[in-house]
A protein has these predicted regions:
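Short acidic, glycine/serine/threonine-rich loops at helix termini
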Residues: 25-27, 85-89, 143-147, 219-224, ...
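Glycine-rich phosphate/diphosphate-binding loop of Rossmann-like nucleotide-binding domains
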Residues: 10-28, 159-163, 169-250
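Single conserved hydrophobic/aromatic residue that forms the stacking wall/gate
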Residues: 314-326
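The feature captures the short pre-catalytic strand/loop hairpin that immediately precedes
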Residues: 305-313, 317
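Glycine-rich phosphate-binding loop
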Residues: 67-80, 238-307
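N-terminal alpha-helical transmembrane segments of multi-pass membrane transport
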Residues: 5-11, 21-26, 30-56, 64-67
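N-terminal glycine-rich phosphate/adenylate-binding segment common to multiple enzyme folds
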Residues: 50-166, 273-277
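Short glycine/threonine-rich loop-to-helix capping motif typified by GTGT followed
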Residues: 54-59, 218-228, 260-266, 273, ...
């Protein structure tokens, strides 16, 4: 029998290894499903927690820069350490999330799509095609500032401009004790998010929906709406028409109602918190939270394919952390 001709590769992809059980499964996937059939070329980076600690997390930055160079990366699940992990692994410090570091360098948007297979039936009967969630991965409640406010205090929003002038806005006069929260976002980040969404819609030939609550949040959410519309009108409207797809904006509550009634088959762009919640809801309603793809896409066309889940910690007992897996 003639030897199988492997699929050739010209440009290497960036391989980001992970932690614990993912290292075992990723090696099995390569050995059984990839290496016998593909002349695999990769630039390898070990993002295991021990190596991140050994390199003072430089390896994470280096892997992201390599991804910008080659354009494609595959990333395994990694540990974002908490206090218990710092003690367990004897870490120098509580290192940041590798995903957050990579997303910041690549300026990317996370697209998550349910995997539809026979035998797993969506809980919503009308859903026939996948619904892709595009989640803005910067700002909002995830980079907020919070404070407890005592009774009798007054909370104000103060903006100090470059020329030293100040702008104040009253948040609330607290007759009783309460809480406050400050959030922010950046025009540049919203613009990158919008372009990544529009480009992904063109690449996949799917309609793009975007939803906020601009009727209530007339500055914050409205800014998202305005930036999306400006970029669509100026850069993408003609391309969308040629591709036979559409961009559609609506309020977030209306979007939820439309999503439940729809057949699927589109991209739903969400702000950070909305995307965090809705991606889990959509995946679970399709039948399985674990059955979901996740890809980080940059406006310049860089792709990083990652696990849409964390680590299978329960599959690694304490003895197997110290001994070889049999």
């Amino acid at each position: 029998m003639a030897e199988y001709q492997k699929i050739p590769m010209q440009t290497p992809l960036v391989e980001m290894d992970g932690d614990e059980m993912t290292r075992i499964l990723w090696k099995m996937i390569k050995d059984i499903l990839i290496l016998p059939y593909v002349d695999l070329k990769t630039e390898y980076y070990d993002l295991g927690l021990e190596n991140r600690d050994r390199t003072d997390d430089r390896v994470t930055v280096e892997s992201a820069m390599a991804t910008k160079k080659y354009g494609v990366a595959v990333k395994c699940a990694t540990i974002t350490p908490n206090a218990a992990r710092v003690e367990e692994y004897h870490l120098k410090e509580m290192w940041k999330s590798p995903n957050a570091t990579i997303r910041a360098i690549l300026d990317g948007t996370v697209f998550r799509t349910p995997i539809i297979v026979k035998g797993i039936t969506p809980f919503i009967p009308s859903w026939k095609k996948p619904i892709t969630i595009a989640r803005h991965a910067y700002g909002d409640v995830y980079k907020n500032t919070e404070a407890a406010v005592p009774a009798g205090a007054k909370a104000e929003l103060l903006i100090t401009k470059a020329d030293g002038s100040e702008e104040k806005h009253l948040i609330h006069d607290f007759k009783t004790s309460g809480i406050i929260q400050g959030m922010h976002n950046l025009d540049s980040s919203i613009e990158s998010f919008a372009r990544a969404c529009f480009n992904f819609a063109l690449d996949t030939k799917q309609d793009l929906w975007f939803a906020t609550k601009d009727t209530i949040s007339k500055k914050y959410d409205h800014r998202f709406k305005d930036i999306f519309q400006e970029i669509y009108d100026g850069e993408y409207q003609e391309k969308f028409q040629q591709a036979g797809i559409e961009y559609f904006y609506t309020l977030i509550d209306d979007a939820v109602a439309r999503v439940v009634r729809s057949e699927g088959g589109y991209i739903w762009a969400c702000k950070n918190y909305d995307g965090d919640v809705m991606s889990d809801m959509v995946a679970t309603a399709f039948g399985s939270l674990a059955m979901m793809t996740s890809v980080l896409v940059s406006p310049d066309g860089t792709y990083e394919y990652e696990a849409a889940h964390g680590l299978s910690l329960i599959h690694i007992s304490e003895p197997t952390r110290q001994e070889a897996i049999s």
